[in-house]
Design a protein with these regions (language model features):
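The feature captures the beta-strand-to-loop junction immediately N-terminal to the Walker
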Residues: 30-32
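Conserved ABC transporter NBD signature motif
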Residues: 53-60, 73
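Conserved ABC ATPase "signature" region
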Residues: 107-129, 170-173, 222
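Catalytic Walker B motif of ABC-type/P-loop ATPase nucleotide-binding domains
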Residues: 151-155
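Q-loop/switch helix immediately C-terminal to the Walker
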Residues: 81, 88-99
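Helix-to-loop junction immediately C-terminal to a conserved catalytic motif
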Residues: 45
């Protein structure tokens, strides 16, 4: 995206944000609460229209496309809370995901995605009974089976214990390096980004204040003032 600005309720949420991420690259996004990280994702996925600026995907301007069309062309998104339908089983969630795209995906796509993310569960189990890690893997499988070139991941480690974070860490590396997926990840756990992020962008008050490798940005006085003083 280039020079993205966003106003909500008369308040400026994003101010001239520009970023790019290449296939196979992981870009981490950090910043204090209220920095605009999730709002940036809302613009990129098409939920919020930007006040100004452009969103480009695979060389084409997609700024005017709504959320569902951006999803169909390959912009995938995960959320902080892995919400699954209360009334559907694991198998029914996969069926709904398969039929959301034309041509319909088949059972082979489901099995391939499940193996990739190391997800296994009784297909007749109500999806709502899955633990947090398996809910995340179920929803990620539903995205991955259509091979999106870009994934927006909003705090994928939220609610996970340390061993589960390590598992998800490995999974993100597989998606980026073996499937060549471009990944933008909002995450508060610096130790996770230290192992998976190729670059890190830091936001504060709706603006990008620093970008580069993690070690470099953590030494930036603006980052220490805006991010770490807020955290501590």
């Amino acid at each position: 995206c280039k020079e993205i600005s966003l106003d909500l309720g008369g308040r400026e949420i994003l101010k001239d944000i520009s970023l790019q991420v290449a296939s196979g690259e992981v870009l981490g996004v950090i910043g204090p609460n209220g920095a605009g990280k999730t709002s940036l994702f809302e613009v990129l996925c098409g939920r919020f229209p930007a006040k100004s600026g452009t969103v480009t995907f695979k060389g084409q301007d997609v700024s005017a496309l709504p959320l569902y069309q951006r999803a169909r062309i390959g912009i995938g998104r995960t959320y902080q809370t892995p919400v699954v339908p209360d009334e559907l089983t694991v198998a029914e969630v996969f069926k709904a995901a398969r039929q959301a795209y034309k041509p319909y995906l088949n059972r082979w796509h489901v099995l391939w995605a499940m193996r990739l993310v190391r997800f296994s569960a009784d297909p007749d189990m109500p999806a709502v009974q899955l633990d947090t890690l398996d809910r995340r893997k179920l929803l990620l499988s539903c995205l991955i089976m259509r091979r999106p070139p870009l994934l927006l991941m909003d705090e994928p480690a939220a609610g996970l214990i340390n061993s589960e974070v390590d598992d998800f860490d490995d999974l993100i590396r597989v998606l980026a390096k073996e499937l060549n997926v471009a990944i933008i990840i909002v995450e508060h756990r610096i130790e996770l980004l230290d192992t998976i992020a190729d670059r890190v962008m830091v936001m504060d008050a709706g603006e990008k204040i620093s970008e580069g490798d993690l070690g470099m940005v953590l030494k930036d006085p603006r980052v220490r003032a805006a991010y770490f003083e807020d955290v501590h």
